[in-house]
């Protein structure tokens, strides 16, 4: 059906499975977030064993996907951002049988926002490392502010993009990211939801991001996401995009 609709306009091709391998999102369904956070303190061995079993399960799933040639390849997106790179696919790539080293993965642990950097390192970064290392490249983060946990995120050897959410301190984030990673900024979408669309506020907000990334030599991308409403004015989206392009010199 897609081929019939878009033939001649868009290239249509079959794709395999694009893995989403979060440890903590499934846990939030099995236990409440509150119970899981208490368990880290009260039952750390239980939590470590639960995470270890999940990691073993994910790695086994990847083994099966690779063996059967069911993984995706040539991703256009990785967790709402462009999957642009000249580092992938890996050497020896076989489009009929792609492997995890040919593609991006994304990691996140939003429910660990309130834990210390050391706990984040122990229960997320170190536990997830076998999964991270299995893939070609890693995009890390979502809505969780990582400004005080950048040192831990940077331990991931193949991380290339790091999320800078609306709740993150941009100065701290940029000082850690520098030119080593993509500064994947998620500007505040609330500016599109006000009763009156204030273009000056949008410009000020975006300019601050461009300035801090420029001062620290950060490669920058702007990702507008998590939009709740545009107050029945979809033109706010195009105006936001126009302002962003004007600021970055596009």
Question: Where do the protein language model's features map onto the residues?
Answer:
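Active-site loop segments of alpha/beta catalytic cores
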Residues: 1-250
